[in-house]
Amino acid sequence: GGTTSSTCNDWTSSSNSYTGCANEVDSTQTFCQETFHKCNENLAVLCVQYSTAQTVPPTTTAPISSPLTKIVVSALSNGQNGNLGGIKGADAKCQADAQKYNKPGLWRALLGTKSKSVQSFFTGSQASSLKVYNSKNELMADNWNAFMKFNTRKQTYFYAFQGRKVDEGTGASPDWADAD
């Protein structure tokens, strides 16, 4: 993740010759930052709600939104390999899964690239003041900065959009085979 080169060619490769890290949580309770997994392995991909705006019909010029009051993190409901169609493809998967399971707002994949770190998703007062919750509305961290470091994380579980707990040791659901 982050600005390392372990991003499965910026999330466009499922080759076993690449190694990558979809920012899943490892056993030390931190986002994996090294090359732990082959890009052809199915892992959980985390998504973050970055806006309360709703998707709107084409006749409306702008989405309706209210100020963001908290940050919510969920996971895709099915494991994914490293070929997510790039960041845009991964973002589209997050948005589609959120809509499928009636999660409001706009969602994007919590993935870094070679040039952009996930830390930069929220900056300034948002990064220091908005609390971070999982999709079951359980407090995970007092703010984005703490969430990125896990130094004061309250709740250790991520959940997929459909409600399944995501395993922290591997970043995958205990049984993706029964996912919707």
Q: What is the meaning of each model-derived region?
A:
Residues G1-D180:
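Secreted/extracellular ectodomain signature
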